[in-house]
């Protein structure tokens, strides 16, 4: 285990591109988490006297066509995007793992029906399917998250099911069943 960690650390130190992008992603995460403290203006505040104002000391990236601070909008947008991404991954993981575990453990008709549903969802590219579902649900961050979770849980379900089926075949599980402990 320590050997793998050593190799990963060595890769991180030797590969300049990896190091650059790691620092860039870390900086983006920090800036987006600190958005409420870094943004000096309300990102939704309309100021018609500052329409398309150039960048300056007060408005670092200037203003848009209705006078809103572009830098503040960028920070708040990044924070919302990262929140949505983390939420989609967490929900997809929890839902997919639960469904996959139940299917792998129960087997039979439940497993067959759910895995055919997984096959049907995975037959379409995730992005196109998510956009289609979001179009049916309507606009908004909540509906976008729901659409992405609907397409994202399938990978976790398939992986969890495979692991459960693998563990069910292990000798110690069979021995526990034979001895009446299961």
Regions flagged by a language model, labelled:
Residues 70-105:
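Transmembrane alpha-helix signature in integral membrane proteins
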Residues 20-34, 87, 91, 95, ...:
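Lipid-exposed faces of alpha-helical membrane segments in multi-pass integral membrane proteins
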Residues 13, 71-83, 111-122, 138:
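Alpha-helical membrane-interface segments at transmembrane helix boundaries
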Residues 31-66:
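Hydrophobic alpha-helical transmembrane segments of membrane transport/permease proteins
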Residues 60, 64, 95, 104-167:
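Generic hydrophobic transmembrane alpha-helix motif, especially the helices
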Residues 1-41, 117:
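N-terminal signal-anchor/first transmembrane alpha helix
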């Amino acid at each position: 285990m320590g050997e793998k960690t050593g190799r990963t650390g060595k890769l991180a130190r030797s590969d300049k591109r990896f190091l650059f992008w790691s620092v860039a992603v870390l900086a983006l995460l920090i800036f987006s988490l600190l958005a409420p403290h870094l943004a000096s203006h309300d990102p939704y505040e309309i100021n018609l006297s500052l329409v398309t104002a150039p960048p300056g000391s007060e408005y670092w990236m200037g203003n848009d066509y209705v006078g809103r601070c572009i830098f503040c909008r960028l920070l708040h947008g990044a924070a919302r995007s990262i929140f949505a991404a983390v939420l989609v991954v967490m929900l997809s993981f929890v839902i997919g793992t639960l469904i996959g575990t139940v299917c792998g453990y129960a087997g039979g008709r439940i497993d067959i029906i759910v895995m055919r549903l997984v096959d049907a969802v995975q037959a379409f590219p995730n992005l196109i399917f998510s956009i289609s579902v979001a179009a049916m649900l309507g606009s908004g961050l909540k509906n976008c998250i729901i659409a992405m979770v609907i397409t994202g849980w399938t990978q976790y379900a398939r992986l969890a099911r495979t692991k459960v089926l693998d563990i069910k075949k292990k000798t110690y599980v069979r021995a526990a069943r034979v001895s009446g402990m299961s």
